[in-house]
């Protein structure tokens, strides 16, 4: 029996506060999370601690039928029990069932549960040449393929493009060209006129544009002559004409589980008075507070991780004019001389579209398909029409949700972008990101290990009760996220300072004057 079948009843359980687990992928992920939680329940005696059972039994008595002999999804959904509770595992499982599926990580990050305290990520990279550590990466989305690599011998006689005096007699030259977006690729040229480079063998975007647009350069690629191909690899007495080679390497990164934990201590007097006056159970109330706080903080960590990893938007290919990283409604350049608010809002949509396209160009996986934004930006998107007249507003007819007391999911923009509200944003901004159809196709990964572990004890000095909750999980950055690190060996996948602002799966733009 696979895990999805094993946990089918719990996955499909319905209740007032039970979020739907609709897709097969999400059900598969949640079944692994349930299995990790179940393993912890069975192995840790804490779940059968009499004091903890007593504390949970009063206010969180969902769980089991006839004691602790199995899970009843209907009871878990309704929060009831029909037998003596001797194991709080099902209670905790119910909390996991309600809380984990609502994490924003399922929408903006890849979710890959861990089966142990450490996991590994393996990355295969194809490279040019014999040395897999120093060779330039092949099949890179932002680097043009070396289109003459297979068309020449390893001991190539094509010279680097000189700084001045390039021959115009049909002699080919090669140079590494850096585009305006910062991409570097090897290209081959014929000089038709005088071309000057600042550095031999290296061509800037301006030098390339001036040369090609001015008719001084043409880009060429070709295979080798048959006579040359026949004499490769020392055939018929020839020498120094080996075949060009390609190789690959496999990079390994380690993901380690980290923890979040909170505790709460209260007096016996508080518990007694709370029960007598309000009919509330202190353990139940504090347990809910602690568990919810852990989940809220985890949600916030994922949003902050995405924003900190995001590249500066409105830069490179997406800048055009105006200040980098900022879309200013009061700047006529940014809004393209808009006359009315509707036209200005459309300019914002165009900028979002450009950022989404840039994500697709750099990742080679797909254009951006979700947006995280402040409330004001979401409101602006809600009042913008991309299809009707130039000044029309109301593409969504105001139907986008901007009330985070309901949900942080605002709606779908133009049938393409899922929009989420950052309810804690301190300034207006939007982040465009991409998540593919699989959990491996994302810029960052959330890897839950043990979702929730309850703890209870008494202070050894004052004998007052103490309760706590712990969660364990890992966070990982996609090893292909930095498009500039294609040739270097990636050894650390943790979200360290060196990786901030370089993740091609996300692009962030601040919004002014809204």
Swiss-Prot record:
Which residues bear the site annotation Cleavage? 62-63
Q: PTM comment for this protein?
A: A proteolytic cleavage by the prohead core protein protease gives rise to the mature major capsid protein during virus maturation.
List the Pfam families.
Gp23 (PF07068)
Q: Which residues cross the membrane?
A: none
**Keyword Transmembrane helix annotated:** no
Q: Which positions make up the signal peptide?
A: none
Name the keywords, alphabetized. Capsid protein, Late protein, Virion
List the InterPro entries hit by this protein, alphabetically.
CAPSID_Myoviridae (IPR038997), Gp23/Gp24_T4-like (IPR010762)
A single GO cellular-component term from the record reads:
viral capsid
HAMAP family, sorted: CAPSID_H_T4
The function of this protein is: Major capsid protein that self-associates to form hexamers, building most of the capsid in association with pentons made of the capsid vertex protein and one dodecamer of the portal protein.
Q: Which family does it belong to?
A: Belongs to the T4 phage capsid protein family.
- Describe the protein's quaternary organization and the partners it interacts with: Homohexamer. Interacts with the portal protein. Interacts with the capsid vertex protein that forms pentamers.
Q: Tell me what this protein is called.
A: Major capsid protein
